[in-house]
Amino acid sequence: MAHSSDLALFRHRIAEALPSANVPTLLLLLYQFTGKEYWLTPPFLPVKSVWGDNDSGGLAAELQTEIRNAALDAIICWHSGAPVTKQDLSEEELIRMLTVSEAEPIPPEYADMMLHKLRRYAGAIPDPVSLPKGFRVLIIGAGMSGVAAAIRLRQLGISYIQVEKQDSTGGVWHAHHYPGCGVDTPGHLYSYTFASGNWSTFFPLQKEIDDYFNRVARDFGIESSIRYGTECLVTRYDEESLTWHSRLRLPNGTEETLVTNVVLSAVGGFTTPKWPNLSGLRNFDGPVVHTSKWDPEVALDGKRVAVIGNGASAMQVVPAIADRVGALTIFQRSRQWVAPFPKFQKPVPEPMQFLFREVPHYEWLYRLRLSWIYDSEVHEALQKDPAWPHPDRSVNAVNDRDREAYTQYIEGQLAGRPDLIAKVIPSYPPFGKRMLLDNGWYRTLLKPHVTLVDGAAARVEGRSIHAIDDETHEADLIIVASGYDTTRYLLPVEVIGRNGRTVRDVWDDDDCQAYLGTVVAGFPNFFMLYGPNTALGHRGSFIFTIESQIDYVLSVLRQMGEKRLVEVECRQDIYQHYNRKIQQMHQQMIWSHEGMSTFFRNDRGRIVTNSPWRLVDYWNLLKEADLDDYRTMPQVDSRLETSGVPREGVQRPGSRLRRRPS
């Protein structure tokens, strides 16, 4: 029981927070804390909003006040020791709650996944895994994927070694620090289910995100065991010992070979910068800096700056530097759809941070609502309607309404500048390329010293940049914002599987494929996170996707232990069937629209980055591994202590093994 003075202070802090709280989330909290149907019925039913997470619920001020006052009383009762009335929600209850809160029907098939998220928010961990003594996993990378993987393996007692080529965790968020660098997913979704972000802004910037991954690594006890400054150059499968031999470059420049039973790649997809094929760029008479390799010492103040590209990184860096430079010229190779960003750099008020931190049920329910808004509801609007009469501009009626809404937004932002409006509105459907958020882009285009060139740069001569229309623009500095090589997965690690074939051979360089985005036929005991066709082109929580893949890998390892298996390899027929299915699904979706180019496709036109699945369908595929999808090899000799790796890491002679037929 809280002391009266402590309770009074707590009540005061919560009362400060509630005027800023999300009303639809408070309705969920009230129902869960009190069990009263009253809060899920008229007149408290929220109205669907067009943009954002609908903080007011579209309700009248007096109804909002009643909800906030009731929430204060319910939270104080809970804080004083009252039990949560609806602690264990049924699937039907949760779907009804979300349907009310989101102001639209939530399909019942989402119930299991949503309950799973709530359990994970509350601290549930995966089922135990028991593996033979000496069994080891190599985790390559300690970015957001690698940190999550290491935490789960440590929690389940699985022996692992983790290498990271940088000097810290964080992956791309540690490596990339160009001005304006941040996330375009709400921070409360861009967080592990098991670790709250305690964000200071709703859409955090690079430094806070990097700090988050560092903090989580420390809090969960994995940070001290990461081998920093260690790069995996090559990992090769040895078919005799059924182990992976990984050649590592150590911080002092020497090399070491590490032998493990399993390799789990967490190298990420935004590691290799993509440079434009621009004649004369290397001979530019001034600094040239890529956003992925930003030089904090580069001089910007008063300079004539040219930006090559107008994608996600350009849309962040341009507004961030515009007021510092003397002149800013942006070369736009293709036009982009840009959505409103009402919470751009909007701080989470300190009282709200207190509410998120001290009333975890509120944070869990808030995150659950966001996961529908950003993970799920967009997917249907990306499907091609074969009967739709305007396939050039949109793919269905919903997509056409989106086009109209985004067009109106752009016209409003650039009112009075028909010349700019004509330059920026795309001809292809919204969501055909990566959807961008307006963090001051249009406001920046209106500045008198900013020029938007409607076309790519053609060549560079001295300090002159020639556009494709032969117009010349002078610059002191070139910023290359052309993105990353996203279609060549697993780079820069060389992965060599069965029969000495590299993954680049199997994929014909950039024709990357994987079963469930996680395993590749011909590469036994090898798993990857954020593999081909796992990116969420329809928005959503990339981190939840990664956690789901980790659960799948753990399911495979669990069954390896239970069935005493030393080798699992995805069957070729399963692998091929899945990837045919992926491409068939993509042909019915917006990303195969012919009216635009996109980094989602490789050079031969196949979509290799994006997932065609609804998140709930992909989660169900990953929930439990089916070893019928694999060729497996059991361990026969029960006297063996390990599955291929002696404690000293020295290769032992091959054992008597038998292979289960595919």
From Swiss-Prot:
Entry keyword set: FAD, Flavoprotein, Monooxygenase, NADP, Oxidoreductase, Plasmid
Domain of life (superkingdom):
Bacteria
What would you give as a GO molecular function for this chain, any one? Answer: monooxygenase activity
Pfam families listed in its UniProt record: NAD_binding_8
> Per its Swiss-Prot or TrEMBL entry, what cofactor is needed?
FAD
Q: Where does FAD bind?
A: S145, E164, W173, D184, Y190
EC number(s) from the headed UniProt entry: 1.14.13.-
Which InterPro entries does its entry note?
Answer: FAD-bind_Monooxygenase_sf, FAD/NAD-bd_sf
At the top of the EC hierarchy, this enzyme's class is oxidoreductase
Q: What segment(s) does the record annotate as region Disordered? A: 638-662
Q: Where is this site: Transition state stabilizer?
A: R434
Could you say which protein family the record assigns here? Belongs to the FAD-binding monooxygenase family.
Name used for this protein in its record: Uncharacterized monooxygenase y4iD
